[in-house]
Protein backbone atom coordinates (compact mmCIF):
# COMPACT_ATOMS: atom_id res chain seq x y z
CA UNK A 1 0.00 0.00 0.00
CA UNK A 2 2.86 2.37 0.59
CA UNK A 3 3.82 2.18 -3.03
CA UNK A 4 0.33 3.03 -4.20
CA UNK A 5 -0.04 5.97 -1.80
CA UNK A 6 3.38 7.27 -2.85
CA UNK A 7 2.28 6.92 -6.41
CA UNK A 8 -0.88 8.97 -5.78
CA UNK A 9 1.17 11.66 -4.07
CA UNK A 10 3.34 11.88 -7.15
CA UNK A 11 0.26 12.21 -9.33
CA UNK A 12 -1.11 14.97 -7.13
CA UNK A 13 2.15 16.88 -7.42
CA UNK A 14 2.02 16.55 -11.17
CA UNK A 15 -1.46 17.98 -11.30
CA UNK A 16 -0.38 20.95 -9.25
CA UNK A 17 2.37 21.79 -11.63
CA UNK A 18 1.29 23.96 -14.57
CA UNK A 19 4.45 23.50 -16.59
CA UNK A 20 3.73 22.58 -20.18
CA UNK A 21 7.21 21.37 -21.19
CA UNK A 22 7.53 18.60 -18.72
CA UNK A 23 4.80 17.05 -16.80
CA UNK A 24 3.26 14.07 -15.40
CA UNK A 25 0.51 12.29 -17.24
CA UNK A 26 -2.31 11.91 -14.72
CA UNK A 27 -4.04 9.29 -16.77
CA UNK A 28 -2.93 6.05 -15.20
CA UNK A 29 -4.08 3.86 -18.04
CA UNK A 30 -2.29 5.90 -20.66
CA UNK A 31 0.96 6.17 -18.74
CA UNK A 32 1.14 2.40 -18.08
CA UNK A 33 1.76 3.14 -14.44
CA UNK A 34 -0.64 0.46 -13.39
CA UNK A 35 1.22 -2.18 -15.43
CA UNK A 36 4.53 -1.06 -13.98
CA UNK A 37 3.10 -1.18 -10.44
CA UNK A 38 1.73 -4.70 -11.00
CA UNK A 39 5.02 -5.85 -12.51
CA UNK A 40 7.00 -4.29 -9.69
CA UNK A 41 4.71 -5.90 -7.10
CA UNK A 42 5.13 -9.30 -8.78
CA UNK A 43 8.90 -8.98 -8.89
CA UNK A 44 9.01 -8.00 -5.23
CA UNK A 45 6.63 -10.78 -4.22
CA UNK A 46 8.30 -13.50 -6.27
CA UNK A 47 11.85 -12.20 -5.84
CA UNK A 48 11.49 -12.04 -2.07
CA UNK A 49 11.48 -15.85 -1.76
CA UNK A 50 14.43 -16.21 -4.14
CA UNK A 51 16.39 -13.45 -2.45
CA UNK A 52 15.59 -14.83 1.01
CA UNK A 53 16.65 -18.35 0.03
CA UNK A 54 19.82 -17.03 -1.65
CA UNK A 55 20.73 -15.00 1.44
CA UNK A 56 19.96 -17.93 3.76
CA UNK A 57 22.07 -20.24 1.58
CA UNK A 58 24.92 -17.73 1.61
CA UNK A 59 24.59 -17.29 5.37
CA UNK A 60 24.68 -21.07 5.85
CA UNK A 61 27.79 -21.38 3.64
CA UNK A 62 29.52 -18.59 5.55
CA UNK A 63 28.58 -20.19 8.88
CA UNK A 64 29.89 -23.57 7.70
CA UNK A 65 33.10 -21.95 6.46
CA UNK A 66 33.57 -20.23 9.82
CA UNK A 67 32.94 -23.50 11.67
CA UNK A 68 35.41 -25.33 9.42
CA UNK A 69 37.97 -22.59 9.97
CA UNK A 70 37.44 -22.79 13.74
CA UNK A 71 37.82 -26.59 13.63
CA UNK A 72 41.02 -26.26 11.59
CA UNK A 73 42.25 -23.65 14.07
CA UNK A 74 41.55 -26.01 16.96
CA UNK A 75 43.29 -28.86 15.14
CA UNK A 76 46.23 -26.60 14.36
CA UNK A 77 46.40 -25.55 18.02
CA UNK A 78 46.35 -29.20 19.11
CA UNK A 79 49.09 -30.03 16.60
CA UNK A 80 51.07 -27.01 17.79
CA UNK A 81 50.80 -28.17 21.40
CA UNK A 82 51.87 -31.67 20.38
CA UNK A 83 54.79 -30.28 18.41
CA UNK A 84 55.82 -28.10 21.37
CA UNK A 85 55.65 -31.13 23.67
CA UNK A 86 57.73 -33.16 21.23
CA UNK A 87 60.22 -30.30 20.97
CA UNK A 88 60.49 -30.11 24.74
CA UNK A 89 60.97 -33.88 24.96
CA UNK A 90 63.55 -33.79 22.18
CA UNK A 91 65.44 -31.00 23.93
CA UNK A 92 65.36 -32.98 27.18
CA UNK A 93 66.67 -36.07 25.39
CA UNK A 94 69.38 -34.00 23.70
CA UNK A 95 70.46 -32.57 27.06
CA UNK A 96 70.58 -36.07 28.55
CA UNK A 97 72.60 -37.33 25.60
CA UNK A 98 75.01 -34.40 25.96
CA UNK A 99 75.43 -35.07 29.68
CA UNK A 100 75.96 -38.78 29.09
CA UNK A 101 78.43 -38.04 26.29
CA UNK A 102 80.38 -35.67 28.53
CA UNK A 103 80.35 -38.21 31.34
CA UNK A 104 81.46 -40.97 28.98
CA UNK A 105 84.18 -38.73 27.55
CA UNK A 106 85.47 -37.96 31.07
CA UNK A 107 85.40 -41.65 31.98
CA UNK A 108 87.20 -42.62 28.77
CA UNK A 109 89.75 -39.85 29.31
CA UNK A 110 90.39 -40.93 32.90
CA UNK A 111 90.65 -44.57 31.81
CA UNK A 112 93.07 -43.71 29.02
CA UNK A 113 95.18 -41.58 31.37
CA UNK A 114 95.22 -44.31 34.03
CA UNK A 115 96.10 -46.94 31.42
CA UNK A 116 98.81 -44.63 30.08
CA UNK A 117 100.28 -44.24 33.56
CA UNK A 118 100.23 -48.01 34.06
CA UNK A 119 101.87 -48.51 30.66
CA UNK A 120 104.54 -45.94 31.50
CA UNK A 121 105.21 -47.60 34.86
CA UNK A 122 105.33 -51.03 33.23
CA UNK A 123 107.67 -49.80 30.51
CA UNK A 124 109.82 -48.03 33.11
CA UNK A 125 109.99 -51.18 35.22
CA UNK A 126 110.69 -53.31 32.15
CA UNK A 127 113.37 -50.83 31.11
CA UNK A 128 114.93 -50.89 34.58
CA UNK A 129 114.76 -54.68 34.62
CA UNK A 130 116.31 -54.85 31.15
CA UNK A 131 119.04 -52.43 32.19
CA UNK A 132 119.72 -54.42 35.37
CA UNK A 133 119.86 -57.67 33.38
CA UNK A 134 122.17 -56.06 30.84
CA UNK A 135 124.38 -54.72 33.66
CA UNK A 136 124.55 -58.18 35.27
CA UNK A 137 125.34 -59.79 31.95
CA UNK A 138 128.03 -57.20 31.23
CA UNK A 139 129.45 -57.66 34.75
CA UNK A 140 129.54 -61.44 34.22
CA UNK A 141 131.21 -60.98 30.85
CA UNK A 142 133.74 -58.58 32.37
CA UNK A 143 134.38 -60.95 35.29
CA UNK A 144 134.75 -63.87 32.88
CA UNK A 145 137.11 -61.85 30.72
CA UNK A 146 139.12 -60.74 33.76
CA UNK A 147 139.23 -64.34 34.98
CA UNK A 148 140.35 -65.55 31.56
CA UNK A 149 143.03 -62.85 31.42
CA UNK A 150 144.17 -63.65 34.96
CA UNK A 151 144.40 -67.37 34.17
CA UNK A 152 146.33 -66.65 31.00
CA UNK A 153 148.67 -64.32 32.87
CA UNK A 154 149.16 -66.79 35.70
CA UNK A 155 149.63 -69.60 33.18
CA UNK A 156 152.18 -67.52 31.34
CA UNK A 157 153.97 -66.65 34.58
CA UNK A 158 153.83 -70.23 35.73
CA UNK A 159 155.41 -71.45 32.57
CA UNK A 160 158.31 -69.06 33.03
CA UNK A 161 158.77 -69.58 36.77
CA UNK A 162 157.81 -73.19 37.07
CA UNK A 163 160.60 -75.46 36.50
CA UNK A 164 160.57 -79.22 36.88
CA UNK A 165 162.12 -79.04 40.35
CA UNK A 166 159.64 -76.39 41.49
CA UNK A 167 156.75 -78.46 40.18
CA UNK A 168 157.90 -81.52 42.12
CA UNK A 169 158.30 -79.40 45.26
CA UNK A 170 154.76 -77.92 44.91
CA UNK A 171 153.30 -81.36 44.35
CA UNK A 172 155.12 -82.79 47.38
CA UNK A 173 153.97 -79.87 49.55
CA UNK A 174 150.40 -80.33 48.49
CA UNK A 175 150.58 -84.08 49.12
CA UNK A 176 152.04 -83.46 52.54
CA UNK A 177 149.32 -80.98 53.42
CA UNK A 178 146.74 -83.50 52.31
CA UNK A 179 148.73 -86.27 53.92
CA UNK A 180 146.35 -87.53 56.46
CA UNK A 181 143.18 -86.83 54.55
CA UNK A 182 143.68 -89.40 51.84
From Swiss-Prot:
Membrane topology, record value: Single-pass membrane protein
Annotated keywords: ATP synthesis, ATP-binding, CF(0), Chloroplast, Hydrogen ion transport, Ion transport, Membrane, Nucleotide-binding, Plastid, Thylakoid, Transmembrane, Transmembrane helix, Transport
InterPro entries, alphabetized: ATP_synth_b/b'su_bac/chlpt
Keyword Nucleotide-binding: yes
Cellular component terms per the entry's GO annotation: chloroplast thylakoid membrane; proton-transporting ATP synthase complex
One Pfam family per UniProt: ATP-synt_B
Transmembrane portions of the chain: 33-51
GO molecular function: ATP binding; proton-transporting ATP synthase activity, rotational mechanism
Miscellaneous comment text of the record: In plastids the F-type ATPase is also known as CF(1)CF(0).
PANTHER family referenced in this protein's UniProt entry, alphabetically: ATP SYNTHASE SUBUNIT B, CHLOROPLASTIC
HAMAP family listed in its UniProt record: ATP_synth_b_bprime (MF_01398)
Assembly, per entry: F-type ATPases have 2 components, F(1) - the catalytic core - and F(0) - the membrane proton channel. F(1) has five subunits: alpha(3), beta(3), gamma(1), delta(1), epsilon(1). F(0) has four main subunits: a(1), b(1), b'(1) and c(10-14). The alpha and beta chains form an alternating ring which encloses part of the gamma chain. F(1) is attached to F(0) by a central stalk formed by the gamma and epsilon chains, while a peripheral stalk is formed by the delta, b and b' chains.
Sequence similarity: Belongs to the ATPase B chain family.
Function of the protein: F(1)F(0) ATP synthase produces ATP from ADP in the presence of a proton or sodium gradient. F-type ATPases consist of two structural domains, F(1) containing the extramembraneous catalytic core and F(0) containing the membrane proton channel, linked together by a central stalk and a peripheral stalk. During catalysis, ATP synthesis in the catalytic domain of F(1) is coupled via a rotary mechanism of the central stalk subunits to proton translocation. Component of the F(0) channel, it forms part of the peripheral stalk, linking F(1) to F(0).
Name recorded for this polypeptide: ATP synthase subunit b, chloroplastic
Source organism (scientific name): Guillardia theta (Cryptophyte)
Originating gene: atpF
Amino acid sequence: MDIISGFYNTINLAELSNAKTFGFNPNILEANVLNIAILLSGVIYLGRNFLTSALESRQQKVTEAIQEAEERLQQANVKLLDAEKQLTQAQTVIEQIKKEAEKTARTVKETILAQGKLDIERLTNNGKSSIEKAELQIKKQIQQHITDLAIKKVSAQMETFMTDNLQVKVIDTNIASLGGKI
